[in-house]
């Protein structure tokens, strides 16, 4: 019978793969249409109602694209709506949140040293932060502040900074970054689902019926689309950050997250300006570089823990196991030279993925990962540099599978 932990790990991999694929589709189409829209040109003799056009070449063929702000003379029977890329990305992302962070809440979501809570409370708090994030954003956009694009963006940035700070006081550093990305991605996808597509459908229905559409729908959709454009790169950074503990494992992780949003805006501003043929603002790259150097410096400030590391409730069974003393000796001797608060292995300056196995709490909390990486597979240590034996691997398997029995 297949081990459940192995099945769950493959499920996590499959959902992550799906999320990456759908994300590529969404981001690709989004970037393409932003560049296309900004690059449209007008010329004499264009069809009635055409706002602009663009000639493109790709894959050995030529494409002639025209944009209409109102219905063309003959409304096509079929329209391609670009929406499922967004929906599928959010759904697969939420599925991954459930598979990794909710199913493994005691390890990946909750840090007893930050805020002790039960797994159900942590999960409810997670869902609440994601939902409240969208509600606050939407209310701000619909408020009088929404009439000023610049003013709205500045206020939204301050809100994101506050959320980043708050999340680091609720969850693990890794989960805080992931949730900031999830809140931002939810805002982006909800913009498509609840604003952009519905508004576009209203406009299309009016055009088909021969009515003059209200320009406010297009203006609102364009504002939300602009927000999505500028939020894309920070979301990608936040989603990738769980592989780089230097980003989330520092005392100033919330400051790093806040600076990443500015970097993303600077980079997108450069490409938007170039695609619009309105100049070549190289200064944006200099600004992004300076901010990234500041991020590197901030990442060197470790997160200070007060008191002894606390063991999560679900990990107590692994410490109580009769195998634990031998397992501890094995892990300390074979793994902790890298996976420690202060690694001693040459070339390793920070614990890979932030996983520290130099305490009883760290070993017990990461029992499942030790079992999969060093017990059931030979993925760890890399190239077996610490020469862990088959007998020791069998011990790790027996410890995990026998815990609580």
Question: Where does each model-flagged region fall?
Answer:
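Alpha-helical transmembrane segments and their membrane-interface junctions
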Residues: 81, 86-105, 164-178, 231-250
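Loop-to-transmembrane boundary segments
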Residues: 69-94, 200, 215-234
């Amino acid at each position: 019978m297949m081990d459940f932990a192995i099945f769950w790990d493959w499920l996590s991999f499959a959902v992550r793969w799906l999320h990456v694929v759908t994300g590529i589709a969404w981001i690709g189409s989004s970037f393409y249409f932003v560049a296309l829209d900004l690059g449209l040109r007008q010329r004499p003799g264009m069809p009635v109602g055409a706002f602009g056009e663009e000639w493109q070449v790709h894959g050995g063929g030529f494409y002639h694209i025209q944009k209409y702000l109102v219905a063309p003379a003959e409304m096509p029977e079929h329209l391609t709506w670009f929406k499922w890329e967004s929906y599928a990305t959010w759904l697969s992302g939420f599925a991954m949140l459930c598979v990794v962070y909710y199913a493994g809440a005691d390890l990946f979501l909750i840090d007893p040293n930050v805020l002790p809570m039960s797994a159900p409370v942590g999960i409810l708090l997670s869902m609440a932060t994601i939902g409240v994030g969208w509600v606050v954003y939407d209310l701000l956009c619909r408020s009088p502040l929404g009439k000023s694009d610049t003013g709205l963006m500045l206020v939204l940035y301050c809100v994101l900074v506050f959320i980043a700070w708050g999340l680091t006081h609720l969850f693990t550093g890794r989960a805080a970054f992931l949730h900031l990305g999830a809140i931002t991605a939810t805002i982006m996808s909800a913009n498509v689902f609840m604003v952009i597509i519905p508004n576009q459908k209203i406009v299309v229905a009016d055009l088909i019926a021969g009515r003059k559409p209200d320009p406010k729908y297009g203006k609102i959709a364009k504002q939300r689309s602009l927000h999505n454009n500028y939020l894309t790169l920070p979301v990608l950074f936040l989603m990738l950050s769980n592989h780089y503990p230097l980003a989330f494992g520092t005392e100033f992780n919330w400051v790093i997250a806040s600076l990443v949003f500015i970097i993303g805006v600077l980079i997108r501003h450069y490409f938007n300006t170039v695609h619009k043929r309105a100049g070549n603002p190289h200064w944006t790259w200099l600004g992004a570089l300076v901010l990234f150097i500041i991020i590197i410096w901030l990442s060197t400030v470790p997160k200070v823990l007060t008191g002894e590391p606390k063991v999560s409730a679900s990990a107590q069974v692994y410490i109580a196991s009769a195998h634990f003393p031998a397992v501890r000796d094995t892990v300390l001797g074979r793994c902790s030279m890298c996976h420690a608060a202060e690694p001693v292995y040459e070339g390793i300056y920070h614990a890979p993925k932030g996983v520290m196995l130099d305490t009883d709490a760290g070993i017990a909390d990461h029992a499942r990962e030790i079992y999969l990486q060093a017990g059931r597979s030979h993925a760890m240590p890399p190239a077996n540099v610490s020469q862990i034996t088959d007998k020791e691997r069998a011990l790790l398997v027996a410890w995990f599978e026998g815990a609580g029995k």
